[in-house]
């Protein structure tokens, strides 16, 4: 494969940064363009240290700015699109999520057509498949099964519609007469160092005398380590550029998991943090059906108050379902088509994440000490 270049959107994010760091190791890669709305100074510094034989160009711009996207895509061989707004709690306005996740993806696809970019990889989410009910069990699901989210909540809806747009764009004619080839990856819940979700869970625990909050004690999920997710994107980029592999990948979606044990979200948080003295919440909690209907009542109150007051419930039905379902998927199709095998095993992933959590605990030790006095 001749020299090539790659644009990564959301490059300052949890997954995007890992993809950038892996990409610069790719053979024949001449340039990586890292695009995000804003980069933290420390991220820019880390990227500057990656400057080897591969040029790393940092671009700050809005996914909703069509001209910015067109400039970013000029001369690019592959786009890896990870930029997204993730919110399942109702903090971020619905329209903002739809604009970034759906319209932003549509803008980027159009920029690829105009700039004649032949390959597009979308970082989707398992949320596009559900779960739709905590009562329905999905164990080791796969792509041939018809799993599709029916939620109207902005995050799963926007990601679902964006993925549909990406896969529908496969085969589109480019401005230079070539063809756009696309695929989508659906990672499970992603954990690892710098996970914003784990970071928030640890900070909440430190403010609660070291007791981890109950978020999903009834769930059975198969979390995936961030480095393995990034690796799957690298393999997809290789595959779409390889004429021998590309035909089986074009227009396809893939569940991305690894060998992390199936467990509840609460068990995962505890397993990763127990070495640092954090412990699970042993207090009694409401039965799941009652929690679900309470969420419905809170959503109803929020809807009725909307004309005069913006009330955000502490939890909603989608969050309750997401956090308390049995919902796991196999990576066999990615293994078959992309040659995907997890780079990092569970023990190593657990150790790396736990060590990172340890640094958070030490940095914020005064919170725990104050709360325990």
From Swiss-Prot:
Belongs to the 3-beta-HSD family. NADP(+) binds at residues 10-15, 155, 159. One of its GO terms (biological process) is androgen biosynthetic process. Steroidogenic tissues (includes testes, ovaries and adrenal glands). This is 3 beta-hydroxysteroid dehydrogenase/Delta 5-->4-isomerase type 1. Its EC number is 1.1.1.145, 1.1.1.270, 1.1.1.210, 5.3.3.1. Its main location: endoplasmic reticulum. The chain crosses the membrane at residues 288-308. Gene3D superfamilies: NAD(P)-binding Rossmann-like Domain. InterPro entries: 3Beta_OHSteriod_DH/Estase (IPR002225), Lipid_A_modif_metabolic_enz (IPR050177), NAD(P)-bd_dom_sf (IPR036291). Pfam families: 3Beta_HSD (PF01073). Coiled coil: none annotated. It is a single-pass membrane protein. The active site is at 159 (proton donor). A bifunctional enzyme responsible for the oxidation and isomerization of 3beta-hydroxy-Delta(5)-steroid precursors to 3-oxo-Delta(4)-steroids, an essential step in steroid hormone biosynthesis. Specifically catalyzes the conversion of pregnenolone to progesterone, 17alpha-hydroxypregnenolone to 17alpha-hydroxyprogesterone, dehydroepiandrosterone (DHEA) to 4-androstenedione, and androstenediol to testosterone. Additionally, catalyzes the interconversion between 3beta-hydroxy and 3-oxo-5alpha-androstane steroids controlling the bioavalability of the active forms. One of its GO terms (cellular component) is mitochondrial membrane. It catalyses: a 3beta-hydroxy-Delta(5)-steroid + NAD(+) = a 3-oxo-Delta(5)-steroid + NADH + H(+); pregnenolone + NAD(+) = pregn-5-ene-3,20-dione + NADH + H(+); 3beta-hydroxyandrost-5-en-17-one + NAD(+) = androst-5-ene-3,17-dione + NADH + H(+); androst-5-en-3beta,17beta-diol + NAD(+) = 17beta-hydroxy-androst-5-en-3-one + NADH + H(+). Keywords: Endoplasmic reticulum, Isomerase, Lipid metabolism, Membrane, Mitochondrion, Multifunctional enzyme, NAD, NADP, Oxidoreductase, Steroid metabolism, Steroidogenesis, Transmembrane, Transmembrane helix. Pathway: Steroid hormone biosynthesis; Steroid metabolism. It is found in: Endoplasmic reticulum membrane; Mitochondrion membrane. GO terms for molecular function: 3-beta-hydroxy-Delta5-steroid dehydrogenase (NAD+) activity; 3-beta-hydroxysteroid 3-dehydrogenase (NADP+) activity; 5-alpha-androstane-3-beta,17-beta-diol dehydrogenase (NADP+) activity; steroid Delta-isomerase activity.
């Amino acid at each position: 494969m001749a020299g090539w270049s790659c644009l990564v959107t959301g490059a300052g994010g949890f997954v995007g940064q890992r993809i950038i760091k892996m990409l610069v190791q790719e053979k024949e890669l001449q340039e990586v363009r890292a695009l995000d709305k804003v980069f933290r100074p420390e991220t820019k510094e880390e990227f500057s240290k990656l400057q080897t034989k591969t040029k790393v160009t940092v671009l700050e711009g809005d996914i909703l700015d069509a001209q910015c996207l067109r400039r970013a895509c000029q001369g690019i061989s592959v786009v890896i699109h990870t930029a997204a707004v993730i919110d399942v709690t109702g903090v971020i306005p619905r329209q903002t999520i739809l604009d970034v996740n759906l319209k932003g993806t549509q803008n980027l696809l159009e920029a690829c057509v105009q700039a004649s970019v032949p390959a597009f990889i979308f970082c989707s989410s398992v949320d596009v498949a559900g779960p739709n009910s905590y009562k329905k069990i999905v164990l080791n699901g796969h792509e041939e099964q018809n799993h599709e989210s029916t939620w109207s909540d902005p995050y799963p809806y926007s990601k679902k519609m964006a993925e549909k747009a990406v896969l529908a764009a496969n085969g589109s004619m480019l401005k230079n007469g070539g063809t756009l080839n696309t695929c989508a990856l659906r990672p499970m819940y992603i954990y690892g160092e710098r996970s914003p979700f784990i970071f928030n869970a640890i900070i909440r625990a430190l403010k609660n005398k070291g007791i981890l909050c109950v978020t999903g004690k009834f769930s059975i999920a198969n979390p995936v380590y961030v480095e393995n997710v990034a690796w799957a994107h690298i393999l997809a980029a290789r595959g779409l550029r390889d004429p021998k592999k590309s035909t089986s990948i074009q227009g396809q979606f893939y569940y991305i998991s690894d060998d992390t044990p199936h467990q509840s979200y609460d068990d995962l948080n505890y397993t990763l943090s127990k070495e640092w003295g954090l412990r699970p919440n042993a207090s009694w909690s409401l039965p799941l059906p009652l929690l679900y209907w309470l969420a419905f009542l809170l959503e109803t109150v929020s809807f009725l108050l909307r004309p005069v007051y913006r009330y955000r419930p502490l939890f909603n039905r989608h969050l309750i379902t997401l956090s308390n379902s049995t919902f796991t998927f196999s990576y066999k199709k990615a293994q078959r088509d992309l040659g995907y095998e997890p780079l990092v095993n569970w023990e190593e992933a657990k150790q790396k994440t736990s060590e990172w959590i340890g640094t958070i605990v030490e940095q914020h030790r005064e919170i725990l000490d104050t709360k325990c006095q």
